[in-house]
């Protein structure tokens, strides 16, 4: 039995055939525009909810072996949504990568952040410090190790580590809103 107690409405229901197995993928919207995706397996024993994933489908691929782009809430340094590709493996939605690529605003534009105080980081050439007035453009985030990826306006790639803390659910770590113990709002605008 599939209960959608927390759902305000259903955005879409999709039939997925993969390696002879039939699934139904349901995308819902919950409170505060928060999304949830349910993967239901259909077989001779009936209908079984096998996997859930926070987020919204970006699109449904014609070939499910290509994976499903899912945009999830990722709130790190002023970003809001991040995209990962998930595959159906062993009856579960599984991401092959831990990195969320930032989605930007509806037009795809990524925000620029201006540095207010010195921030240690790593650029293509090695370790360095961003100085007040420098601008970075968020690109991606890995919640597994707290690496925040960015580019400078000239296209130079860089990254910095954000602080992680337990979020209270299953021992997972989440962004604490600080970098090196300093509140993000003191470091960036």
What are the roles of these predicted feature ranges?
Residues 60-189:
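Acidic, small-residue rich beta-repeat scaffolds with periodic aromatic anchors
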Residues 7-11, 19-27, 33-35:
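Core segments of small alpha/beta cavity-forming domains
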Residues 15-28, 64-72:
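Acidic/hydrophobic-patterned starts of short beta strands in beta-sheet-rich repeat architectures
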Residues 1-4, 36-53, 86-98:
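Surface-exposed loop/turn elements that mediate protein-protein interactions on large endomembrane-trafficking
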Residues 30-35, 77-81:
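Short, solvent-exposed loop/turn segments at conserved positions within beta-propeller repeat blades
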Residues 7-15, 52-65, 102-106:
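Repeated scaffold domains used in trafficking and secretory/extracellular systems
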Residues 29-30, 142:
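Residue-level signature of beta-propeller blades and closely related beta-rich strand-turn architectures
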Residues 17-19, 41-48, 62-64:
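A short, structured loop/turn motif at beta-sheet edges
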